[in-house]
Curated annotation (Swiss-Prot):
Residues 509-694 form the DUF724 domain. It comes from the Eukaryota. Homodimer. Residues 376-464 are annotated as: Disordered. It comes from Arabidopsis thaliana. InterPro entries: Agenet-like_dom, Agenet_dom_plant, DUF724. The lineage of its organism: Eukaryota, Viridiplantae, Streptophyta, Embryophyta, Tracheophyta. This is DUF724 domain-containing protein 3. Disruption phenotype: No visible phenotype under normal growth conditions.
Length: 695
C-alpha cells in the first residue's frame, strides 16, 4: 500500500531514528535546521523536540545521516477509525518517541497489547497512543502487510501461570516470547497481577523459565461449595498456593491449610478454586490425591520370631498388625467403657501394664497404678477386613494373644507344674532372670502345650486399656524355655505384688550398662530440658545395638536442641522441615519435643510474616518507582518550562533594548522637531521685521 509522496526541507518537522543500542526501532520528533544537499552522505543538523542535552537545559542537537531522517507520517494513520488488527505493525507513543511493535491482542476499554522485539517485551497501550506503522522509502510511504499471528497455545500475549519451586506458588504471568536456550524450549514471561493486566507497567521484569514451569490458566471454577479435606488452591500474595480444606465456616469461608507451610488461614470462597493438574496438554482433576491422614494410634511392632509348636501359631508382628487393623477399622464392639488407645510413644513412659495369667482365668490386662485397678477381661477378636497398602486382605482369625508372647491361655483349665508352689526367694530369682531376658527374641521354638492352643472358642473383651505396645502389656519374656514356662504365672503375680509395694516401674528394651547414663544427667542441657524416653521402638533392633542406638538418640536430641536455639530468621524452610522431621522421629521414642517444636513453628510463623512484609515492601518499591518515573516527567516539564522562560526572558531583554533604542530615537527626533520649530519661528520673525521696516 503506497501513500502520497512527501519532501523534507529546512525548518520542517521530521522524525529521526538511530542504530544506537536500546534505541533500535524508535523514531523521535525533531526540527530540520538545514536543507538536504545533493549528497546523501552529508549529515544534517537536527534539533530534537522531546530529547534534551546532557545538562537538560536545552533541546538536544545532533548531526544525523540522511538515511535516518524521514518526514512525519500522515495523521490519517493515527485516527481512531483505523482498525488495529492482531498482527498489525504499529508505532507506540512510548518514552518520548514512537516505538515499532506488533499488536498481539485487543483488550477491554479499547486497549491493546503490543509486542516489542528489542528487548522482548509486551506493554499495554490505549488506542490514542498507537498509530499504524509506515515505511518511508524512495520518497513514498508504504504500509507493510499484516503479519500472520501465532495461534499456538503459548503465543505472545497469552495469559499463563508460572510455578515458583521456592515458594510453591503458581503466579499469573504473560507469555512474551517462546525461545530456545541450549536446545531447550523456554519462555520469556512477564509477571502480571491477578486480574490479568499489566497496566502498561513497563517496569515489570521479564523472566526466562523452563517450559515445564508454565501452564495455561485453569478453566473457570463452577464449584458452589468445597468439601472437607478437599484439595484446593487459594490465592495469596502473588499467586495460587495448594492447600486443603480443614474446616467449613459460615458466610462462604473456609479454614485452609497450606501444603507448603502447614499454616492455616481463613479464606473466602471467591479466593479458592479446585486443585487441578496440567499434564500432557490436558487438565486433570486431582483424583489421585490422598487426604491428609491423622496420625493413627501407634502399636509397637516386633520382629517375627520362630513359631511355637502349637496349631496355627502366629508371630507377634502379624498379631500386632491384625489387632491394629481391627482397632483402626472401628469395628470393636462398644461397651459402657470404651477401649481407648492413645499413642504408645507418648504414654509408655508414663504408664505400665502388668498381665497376670493363671490356669483358671483369661488373659488379664490392668492399667499400672499404685493399687491394682479393676481387672478387665479380654477375649479374642475375630479379624475383620483391613486394608493394607490400598488392598483388602482376606478375613483371618488371629490366634490368641498368648502366642505373641509364648504363653498359654485357654478357656479350659490347665494345671501348672509343681514349681508353682516354690518359695518366695526362688520366685524372685526366677523373676529377675525373666526380666533380664524380657523382650529378647531368639530363633528357638517355644514348647507350648497343645492344650493351651485351642483358642477358637476364646473371646477377648477390652473395656478400658491404656494404649501400650503388646510387649509392655505383658511384662514377661518374649520367648520362654520349657523350664521357664511353668513359672510364668507365679512370676507375673509376683510382679504385681512387687508393683503394689514399689509403684510403677519403667520398662526399657535394654539394660543401662554404659557410663554415659551416669554422666549425661550432669550436663547443662539435660538439667535445662530433662528427658525420660522409653525407647520402645528399639525392640525391633538387635539387643546388642539397642543401648548404643539410645545413646545416639540422646546425643542427637540435645544436639538438635542446640541447633534450634541458634536458629536465625533467615534459615531455609528445608532446614526447619528437617529439624521438625528429626524431632518427630525422636518423639516416637518418648522424647518430649513440645518446646523445640513450638520454637520451630514460631520461626516458620515469623518467616511467613516477614515474607508478607517483604512483599509489601516490594509493592511499595514498585509504587515508588512509578512515582519516580512520574516525577521525572514533571522534572522534564519543568526543564522545558524553564527553557521557555529563559527564551521569553531573552526575548524580553531584546524587546527592552529595542524599546529603549526606540525611546532614544523618539527623544532625538523630538529634539530635532523643537529645533526646527525654533528655526521656523525665527524665519517668521525675520519676515515680519523685513515687512515692517521703513522704506
Amino acid at each position: 500500500m503506497e501513500l502520497q509522496t512527501m519532501k523534507i526541507t529546512k525548518d520542517c518537522v521530521v522524525e529521526v531514528s538511530s542504530e544506537e543500542e536500546g534505541f533500535e526501532g524508535a523514531w523521535f520528533r525533531a526540527v530540520l535546521e538545514e536543507n538536504p544537499g545533493n549528497s546523501s552522505r552529508r549529515k544534517l543538523r537536527v534539533r530534537y523536540s522531546t530529547l534534551l542535552d546532557m545538562d537538560g537545559s536545552s533541546p538536544l542537537i545532533e548531526h544525523i545521516e540522511q538515511r535516518f531522517i524521514r518526514p512525519v507520517p500522515p495523521e490519517e494513520n493515527q485516527q481512531k477509525d483505523v482498525v488495529l488488527e492482531e498482527g498489525l505493525l504499529v508505532d507506540a507513543d512510548h518514552k518520548d518517541g514512537w516505538w515499532t511493535g506488533v499488536v498481539v491482542k485487543k483488550m477491554e476499554d479499547d486497549n491493546y497489547l503490543v509486542y516489542f522485539d528489542l528487548p522482548p517485551d509486551i506493554i499495554q497501550f490505549e488506542r490514542k497512543q498507537l498509530r499504524t506503522h509506515l515505511i518511508w522509502t524512495g520518497g513514498t510511504w508504504i504500509q507493510p502487510e499484516i503479519e500472520e499471528s501465532n495461534k499456538s497455545m503459548f503465543s505472545p500475549g497469552t495469559m499463563v501461570e508460572v510455578f515458583s519451586a521456592k515458594e510453591a506458588v503458581w503466579s499469573p504471568a504473560m507469555v512474551v516470547k517462546e525461545t530456545d536456550v541450549d536446545d531447550k524450549k523456554k519462555f520469556i514471561v512477564k509477571d502480571c497481577n491477578r486480574y490479568l493486566s499489566c497496566n502498561g507497567d513497563e517496569a515489570r521484569p521479564t523472566n526466562i523459565v523452563n517450559s515445564r514451569r508454565v501452564r495455561p490458566i485453569p478453566p473457570p471454577s463452577s464449584v458452589d461449595k468445597y468439601a472437607l479435606l478437599e484439595s484446593v488452591e487459594t490465592f495469596s500474595g502473588l499467586g495460587w498456593h495448594k492447600g486443603q480444606v480443614r474446616k467449613i465456616l459460615s458466610e462462604n469461608r473456609y479454614t485452609v491449610r497450606l501444603e507448603a507451610t502447614q499454616q492455616e488461614s481463613t479464606i473466602r470462597h471467591s479466593d479458592l478454586r479446585p486443585f487441578m493438574v496440567w499434564e500432557d496438554g490436558v487438565w486433570y482433576n486431582d483424583l489421585k490425591q490422598k487426604p491428609i491422614k491423622e496420625t493413627p494410634p501407634t502399636i509397637l511392632k516386633r520382629k517375627p520370631m520362630r513359631s511355637c509348636s502349637a496349631a496355627k501359631s502366629m508371630t507377634p508382628t502379624s498379631a500386632t498388625k491384625h489387632l491394629r487393623s481391627f482397632l483402626n477399622s472401628k469395628e470393636i464392639s462398644e461397651t459402657p467403657t470404651k477401649a481407648k488407645f492413645v499413642s504408645a510413644t507418648r504414654e509408655l513412659g508414663k504408664n505400665k501394664a502388668d498381665a497376670v495369667m493363671n490356669d483358671k482365668t483369661h488373659l488379664l490386662i490392668t492399667p499400672q497404678e499404685t493399687s491394682i485397678a479393676p481387672v478387665i477381661t479380654v477375649t479374642p477378636l475375630k479379624q475383620q477386613d483391613a486394608e493394607t497398602e490400598g488392598k483388602k486382605s482376606p478375613k483371618k482369625t488371629p490366634e490368641p494373644v498368648k502366642h505373641q508372647n509364648g504363653l498359654e491361655n485357654s478357656s479350659t483349665q490347665h494345671e501348672m507344674p509343681e514349681e508353682e508352689n516354690s518359695n518366695e526367694k526362688s520366685r524372685k530369682r526366677k523373676r529377675e532372670q525373666n526380666q533380664n531376658s524380657n523382650l529378647n527374641e531368639t530363633d528357638e521354638t517355644c514348647n507350648v502345650s497343645k492344650a493351651g492352643v485351642n483358642g477358637t472358642s476364646d473371646t477377648i473383651r477390652v473395656d478400658d486399656v491404656d494404649d501400650q505396645p503388646l510387649s509392655s502389656w505383658i511384662n514377661i519374656p518374649t520367648v520362654l524355655s520349657s523350664d521357664q514356662s511353668s513359672n510364668v504365672v507365679d512370676n507375673s503375680a509376683a510382679d504385681v505384688e512387687e508393683t503394689q509395694a514399689k509403684g510403677a516401674l519403667t520398662i526399657e528394651p535394654f539394660t543401662k550398662n554404659l557410663p554415659f547414663w551416669k554422666t549425661y544427667e550432669m550436663e547443662k542441657g539435660y538439667k535445662t530440658v530433662p528427658q525420660n524416653p522409653h525407647f520402645s521402638p528399639l525392640l525391633e533392633f538387635k539387643e546388642d545395638i539397642r543401648e548404643w542406638s539410645a545413646v545416639g538418640m540422646m546425643v542427637s536430641f540435645y544436639g538438635l536442641l542446640e541447633e534450634v536455639k541458634k536458629l536465625q530468621l533467615d534459615v531455609s524452610s528445608s532446614k526447619l522441615g528437617s529439624l521438625s522431621t528429626c524431632f518427630a522421629e525422636l518423639e516416637k521414642h518418648g522424647f518430649d519435643i513440645a518446646t523445640p517444636q513450638s520454637r520451630i513453628n514460631k520461626v516458620l510463623s515469623l518467616q511467613v510474616g516477614r515474607a508478607k512484609k517483604v512483599e509489601e515492601r516490594k509493592c511499595l518499591e514498585k509504587r515508588i518507582e512509578a512515582e519516580e518515573i512520574e516525577m521525572q516527567k514533571f522534572e522534564h516539564e519543568m526543564v522545558e518550562v524553564e527553557r521557555k522562560m529563559l527564551e521569553l526572558k531573552r526575548r524580553a531583554e531584546v524587546a527592552k533594548e529595542k524599546k529603549e533604542a526606540a525611546d532614544k530615537m523618539i527623544v532625538e527626533m523630538k529634539s530635532s522637531a523643537e529645533t526646527i520649530d525654533q528655526e521656523i519661528a525665527n524665519v517668521e520673525l525675520e519676515f515680519i521685521t523685513s515687512v515692517l521696516a521703513p522704506w
